[in-house]
Amino acid sequence: MRVIVAEARVPFARDGAQLHAHSLVTQLRLRGHDAESVALPFHGRKDELLHEAAAWRMLNLSTSNARTVDVLIATRFPTWFARHPRKVVWLIHQHRAAYDLFGTPYSDFTDSEEDAQLRAQLTALDSKMFAECERIVTNARNTARRVQRFNGIAATPLYHPPPLAEQLRNGPYGDYILLVARLEPLKRVDLAINAMAHVDRSMRLVIVGDGSQRVALERLAAQSDAAARITFTGALWGSAVADLYAGARAVLYTPYDEDYGYVTLEAFLSGKPVITATDSGGPLEFVRDGVNGFVRAPHPEPVASAINRVAADQTLAERLGRDGQSAARAITWDGVIEQLLG
């Protein structure tokens, strides 16, 4: 089949959505399909959202170079606005600031009449575009619940392996807790930094990632009693990240209401337990408290108590990690491609 994967790309950012689209194109090609990614820049400013949706609507992707494109796979807002007779949505997320993040500190939408009208427009337009689609699946149950809640659409969750899957491996259970995330407010890296003041001094925190909050987070870490035990590596990719997963005692991942979250599965495929929060969303679809990790309230002391459990008991960390690894290995690309292409 000839397949286009539609991608709304944030310039100069390498986020989960971009990795998702790249992995999908790669896996389609490995299975003999002629697959390409089509991307338009996405900025996400309120005053640009309708213009960005209109730009996608102007695209007719049913043919390319005088040849038929069999399927268009849309991924995140506003890629499903593109025109194609056989459009499938593999929903990563909608424009969350107008939906589930509205009313939280993570949204730039206010209670103003103007913003209320824009939110209503976006909801109506999304619903109209979804009605054009042959099939709607999501990357996680959490995402499916949102589209059901806001648009009244039933969607099937479709899990897929993380991009690093082939490079991840078991390794020694070292003296550090690993945190891999973009340094943005939704990832709540400050929670991990504040927790370290309550963590046994034998444990370090290694933070992998970059983003708009890096300077503020480095300043927060420098002011902490645990400053000497907190390291920022910046953005790392490929084997460099896999090596850090392999050597960690456990992985800390406490975002706010994550859609899916590759980090959970990357940790499990490395045989490491995951510590997450009760409101972290996607990770809760995989992390079972006391079985393959810990689920704690999103506050420094409870998170620190979970870290201290694995710090004091390496055997426990190994047992939890083994359980997570077996579950993560059951997620494969073959089933994903079959469901997407029908």
Predicted regions and their residues:
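Membrane-proximal helix-turn-helix segments that form the acceptor-binding/catalytic region
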Residues: 107-108, 112-136, 144
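Conserved donor-binding/catalytic core segment of Leloir-type glycosyltransferases
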Residues: 168-187, 193-200, 206
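Nucleotide-activated donor-binding/catalytic signature segment of Leloir-type glycosyltransferases, i.e.
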Residues: 218-236
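Short alpha-helical donor nucleotide-sugar binding micro-motif in glycosyltransferases
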Residues: 235-236, 243-248
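Aromatic "clamp/platform" in nucleotide-sugar-dependent glycosyltransferases that forms part
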Residues: 256
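Short hydrophobic beta-strand element within catalytic cores of glycosyltransferases
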Residues: 273-277
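Conserved acidic donor-binding segment of nucleotide-sugar-dependent glycosyltransferases
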Residues: 289-301, 309-314
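A short, well-ordered alpha-helix in the C-terminal region of glycosyltransferases
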Residues: 309, 316-330
